[in-house]
Every structure is written in C-alpha cells, then in structure tokens.
Amino acid sequence: MGSCVSSPLKGSPFGKRPVRRRHSSNSRTSSVPRFDSSTNLSRRLIFQPPSRVLPEPIGDGIHLKYDLGKELGRGEFGVTHECIEISTRERFACKRISKEKLRTEIDVEDVRREVEIMRCLPKHPNIVSFKEAFEDKDAVYLVMEICEGGELFDRIVSRGHYTERAAASVAKTILEVVKVCHEHGVIHRDLKPENFLFSNGTETAQLKAIDFGLSIFFKPAQRFNEIVGSPYYMAPEVLRRNYGPEIDVWSAGVILYILLCGVPPFWAETEEGIAHAIVRGNIDFERDPWPKVSHEAKELVKNMLDANPYSRLTVQEVLEHPWIRNAERAPNVNLGDNVRTKIQQFLLMNRFKKKVLRIVADNLPNEEIAAIVQMFQTMDTDKNGHLTFEELRDGLKKIGQVVPDGDVKMLMDAADTDGNGMLSCDEFVTLSIHLKRMGCDEHLQEAFKYFDKNGNGFIELDELKVALCDDKLGHANGNDQWIKDIFFDVDLNKDGRISFDEFKAMMKSGTDWKMASRQYSRALLNALSIKMFKEDFGDNGPKSHSMEFPIARKRAKLLDAPKNKSMELQISKTYKPSGLRN
C-alpha cells in the first residue's frame, strides 16, 4: 500500500491483483463506490469511503502527537510525509492513506492486514519498525521508522563498481527477511527491489523491507489462489492460483538474477507474454555478464527459480547454500559497468512512466463516471442492480460490440470481485474506471502537456530534465546521462524531440505503467490466469511446457475458462482493456 520511503513514488514498477475466493468469512466493511439511487442515476456515482477502516478503536489525534512535514514519497493509495513526534522531536515517516483512494473492499482489507502484519512482525534490523496507527474520517495514518538512504538499485548504480560479493550480501539480507516472515506465519507476496530501502546514506546503513501491503498470514499446508504481486517477480504457481510461502523464494531469486546481470529473467512486452515466459521457465545464463559469474551463484539462482515449488529450495536451504553462507567470500570481481547501466536504465524508465501515471490517475471527471453508470443501467434489463452473463453479453451487442461468449466470460471472471457470478454496479464501474484510465489517449494527452512546458507539441530534453528533477532524478543525483539515454530511446525518429505518438508508444510498451493500478492488475492477471489454465489444460491434458503438479492439475479441472486466444473489448469509448492483446 506504499512505504516509508524517502525517495520518489513507490509502487510496483511492473508491478505490482483479481477475483478473490476467501479462506475466511470474517465480516468486512465495504468500501466500494456506492450509487445513490435517490438521485438522478445518470448524474454521478457517489463514492462513500468506509467510516472505519481499522477494526479496533484507533486514536484520531495524530496532529496532537506529530507534526507532519515535507512529502517523502507518493504511491497509488497514499502519500508519505516526514513527521516529528512533538514530545521527543524524534523523526519518523507517516504514510497517509486517503479513504477516497480505497475504492474496493479488497483495498480496505489490504490496509487492515498491512497494519496487523506490521504489528505482528518482531523488531529486526532489516524490517522497518512500525510505531503506531491513527485514523480519522478522511484517512488512515501509519507511523513508522524513516528510511532516508534511498532504494536498493539507487545504491548499486551510485557505486563506482559492482561485484558478485555485493549481490550476495543483498540476497542474504532479503532471504533473512523472508525467513523472519515465514517464521511468524507471513508470506510477503510482493518482494521486489523497490520494496527495500537503506536506513540512511552511510556505507554501513541497514537494508530494510518497507512494504507489507500485499502480505498475508498463513498456516502450515495452507494454499492460496488470489493473484497478487508484480508480474516480473511472480512465481508460476501464483499464476496457476495454488501457492504457499515458496513464492517468496522465487521472487528473491528473480531479484538475485537482476542483481547479477541487470535485467529480469522473464521479459515480454505484454502481461500475457510475461506470464507465458514465467510458466515456460527458460532462463538465460549465456549473455554477458553471466560468463563472469561463479558456478555457485548460477546454481543457486537456478534452484531458487525452480518452476516446481515442491522441489524449489526453501528459505532455510538458500541461507545454508555456500554462496550465501559465505557471502563475504563471494568473488569480488567487477561484473562490469554494463550491469549498472542496465539497472539504472531499468530504474529511471520505470520512474518516468510512473510519473506519467501519477498525472493520469486523478484526471477522470464525474461526467465519465456517469457515462459508465448509464451503460450499466442500459445493460441491467431486469433492474435488479446486477448484470448476469446474458445481460452483459446482450448489452455489449446493443452498443455495437459483438463479443465472443468466451471473452464475455473472461470479463465476468475478471470483474466479479465477490465471486457471486454477477457484476454489481460497483464492480462494473470500478473495473471500467481503471481500465479506461490505463487505455485512454485523452488522459495520456493531459500527461504529455505536463512535460511539454512550452506548449509546442513536443517534449524536449531540457523539459524532460526539469520534470524528472522534480522527483530527484536529475542533476542532483548526477543522472543527466541516464535521462539523455531515456530521451534517445523514446525519440524514435531521432529528431531531438519527443512527439505525442512517441510518448504514447513508450507508455503502451511493457507493462509497468498499467500494473501500477492494483485493482487493474488484480483483475487483469486473474483473467490471464484463467486463459492460461485453458490453454495449458485442455481436453487432452497439459501441454509439454505445463507444470504437471497434481494439485495444479486438479485445480485446473475446476475452471471453466474461455477458449479464445485473445481478449480485446471496447465498450463505446469507455472500456478498453488494452493490455489483453496478443
């Protein structure tokens, strides 16, 4: 749900979540958008934030105890501020989560669970310390240790050289965090480099895990089917919707792979491509700098990225591996500037895209929401407040969109967050908002204008530098060359400026900008998972590249997934899940 960051925007760079089949029946406060039927239904959707997010009484007097200062970071749900305890003058970080940003019951549960888990975890040098929580009518406030040393990748690229020994030290720290989590019955579920910050700017600063917004409690042998996480770091069994704590070892293995070579092991330009690459599990150990990497390191990465969770190394086995156990003795040979360059480009491009997303995120006017509501009403022929499969299918036909039944089924599965087989107005509107936000050129135009300071229809290098300097990515950190590299990559015709078409092409390649919306990515990855089940487990059994685990095969037979190989819907100008394309 965010972090105690003292660096720019946090969130999944890729990443970064779907239909939930609950393991418990605990009552929950609904926080989804509500339509006020006493008003003109076509006027607007009225969002009613929950009156209480945290289950137990929490003090609402944060401003009596703390002075909130400058902004440290910003994510999809909250803004992190420096805060000072009035009585002691001690500095902390305060994450303010606006209730207006919590658009679904799932979002509310994420906040509740994050607080509960941070209270449960013990004090540990590599886990950010949680102090206390507050709640008032507008927001939830999480007060925790402040981390001012920057992100893991920032520290790597700022050093003059980078070695295998440094990667071993980082990997050991991450695995020790995973061990503590598992010992206390917690699966992290979203391990990625940007969820680790250094406590301060010194060379001896501790690396700390700072975000538990997607973590969950587990019991021995318990399995989960909710798709969460950031695609590049997601284990194959998550996509197959049957997983346990083993997924954290996989994610740590992906991080280690990136630390050693600078790029993710599974890469594609679409979410579907990434998912298939993960399931296929083909890992490249041939390209530079892998020939320089020790056999022990490569062996460890392979065993952490074992596609079978039951033969994958456990966290304890990884920590006992000689390369990790003797991290201080790992080769100290420079892996080359190429690794640092790749990591820096990877980092800055993601931040550029996420800055665009921040601008896009708040630009959806009430008039467009009203249009979505009107569309729902048109489709809801029996006026019972829910869309059945038939109503959605027939409604799409009425507005000129003839969609195959399989794709309609996929859409239903993606949007039906309570799993009752129908779409409420809340579910339809919430998903539509997020998909529209990600696919609409009009919103990208608004973001483009933010960078085009002189209004000449192009983004020039100096304009990009100024915009990214706002996020501490420019001159202050000596990143001029990296910004030039980004500019060169985006400027496809090499005329020294970025047109809107080039800007749009950048934003619609890769997945990170789309996956930054948690609701969007949950729905999208769920739909992809259903599709992959059908492709991998047809009537004749699993294909050759499928994982043939008994539990996964049993689970697959329970799914009634569409046969179609693509999903691309456009409901008028309002609904276009652009990420679901072949």
Swiss-Prot record:
Residues 330-360 are annotated as: Autoinhibitory domain. Ca(2+) 2 binds at residues 416, 418, 420, 422, 427. It is found in: Membrane. Ca(2+) 3 binds at residues 452, 454, 456, 463. The modification Phosphoserine is found at residues 230, 499. Keywords: ATP-binding, Calcium, Kinase, Lipoprotein, Membrane, Metal-binding, Myristate, Nucleotide-binding, Phosphoprotein, Repeat, Serine/threonine-protein kinase, Transferase. Residues 1-36 are annotated as: Disordered. Its EC number is 2.7.11.1. The keyword Nucleotide-binding applies. A lipid is attached at residue 2 (N-myristoyl glycine). Ca(2+) 4 binds at residues 491, 493, 495, 497, 502. Residues 66-324 form the Protein kinase domain. GO terms for cellular component: nucleus; plasma membrane. One of its GO terms (molecular function) is protein serine kinase activity. It comes from the Eukaryota. Ca(2+) 1 binds at residues 380, 382, 384, 386, 391. It catalyses: L-seryl-[protein] + ATP = O-phospho-L-seryl-[protein] + ADP + H(+); L-threonyl-[protein] + ATP = O-phospho-L-threonyl-[protein] + ADP + H(+). Residues 367-402, 403-438, 439-474, 478-513 form the EF-hand domain. Belongs to the protein kinase superfamily. Ser/Thr protein kinase family. CDPK subfamily. There are 3 contiguous domains conserved in the CDPK subfamily: a kinase domain, an autoinhibitory (junction) domain and a calmodulin-like domain. The autoinhibitory domain (330-360) inactivates kinase activity under calcium-free conditions. This is Calcium-dependent protein kinase 24. It comes from Arabidopsis thaliana (Mouse-ear cress).
